[in-house]
């Protein structure tokens, strides 16, 4: 990789790609990490600047406002992109028109605004490669992964919101992570994050007794529960997940009828979380001890 970018890796740094209201950034800062936060929604970015103003002032937090997207070509000089700002569920904002249409089918609406385009590779070059990179930007997660191809060093740990409609796309996500050198994986249910408990012997800086709320991504790195799996094992794990998606998911069999929806609601009450929920894929790099 003689032509790779040699941006330095910083063990004390985390990238929060998709800050929303700063739920995860707050956790990372309290654990003693510095954070580069990315947020496309201007109102949410302003909220985070106000909420975390002290951390910005003391240099522990930098907020990059704008939407991460791939340019159509090297000659593409577009500086803004259409952002579908979800007016019903703020965390569902996206630059992906297909995702926006899916969200409409689920009963939400969006306002289309123009936001600055953020070059993720340029940010990596400027700020360095983080210890952990949390990515959750509604359909654009793979853009960040592809940008990492250019860099010699990779984050020790990375997480993305896993595909939940097309199993082939899910396999593509795992293959892309494998291509980048990630060889250990975990599938983490996100609908029950509020029940996660930070281990007292935290391997990620220090334990701060954090209480995760709605919108949090939860634990990361070596603090995650469960065993690491290889690529074949994680794909088999997701085969089981997708069987549940086909029955209970957004486009599942039971969602198509009123009695089916009632069954899903009843089951959600019993297990005390949404059914079937959704997952983040966490990955550990082969160079990480």
Where in the sequence are the language-model features?
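Phosphate/nucleotide-binding beta-alpha loop and adjacent structural elements of enzyme active sites
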Residues: 1-289
């Amino acid at each position: 990789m003689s032509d790779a970018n040699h941006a330095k890796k910083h063990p004390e740094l985390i990238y929060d790609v998709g800050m929303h209201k700063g739920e995860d950034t707050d956790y990372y800062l309290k654990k003693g990490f510095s954070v580069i936060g990315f947020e496309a929604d201007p109102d949410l970015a302003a909220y985070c600047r106000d909420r975390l103003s002290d951390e910005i002032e003391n240099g522990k937090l930098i907020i990059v406002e704008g939407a991460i997207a791939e340019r159509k070509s090297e000659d593409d000089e577009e500086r803004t992109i259409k952002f579908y700002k979800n007016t019903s569920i703020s965390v569902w904002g996206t630059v992906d028109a297909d995702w926006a249409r899916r969200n409409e089918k689920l009963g939400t609406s969006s306002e289309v605004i123009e936001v600055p385009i953020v070059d993720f590779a340029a940010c990596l070059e400027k700020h360095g490669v983080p210890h952990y990179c949390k990515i959750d930007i509604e359909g654009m997660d793979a853009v960040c992964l592809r940008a990492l191809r250019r860099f010699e060093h990779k984050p020790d740990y990375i997480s993305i919101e896993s595909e939940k409609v097309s199993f082939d796309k899910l396999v593509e996500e795992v293959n892309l992570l494998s291509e980048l050198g990630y060889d250990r994986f975990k599938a983490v249910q996100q609908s029950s994050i509020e029940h996660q408990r930070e281990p007292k012997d935290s391997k990620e800086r220090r334990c701060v007794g954090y209480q995760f709320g709605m919108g949090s991504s939860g634990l990361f790195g070596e603090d995650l529960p469960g065993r690491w799996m290889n690529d074949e094992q994680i794909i088999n794990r997701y085969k089981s997940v997708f069987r549940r998606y086909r029955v209970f998911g957004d486009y599942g069999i039971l969602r198509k009828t009123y009695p089916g929806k009632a069954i899903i609601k009843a089951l959600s009450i019993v297990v005390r979380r949404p059914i079937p929920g959704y997952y983040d894929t966490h990955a550990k790099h082969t160079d990480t001890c």
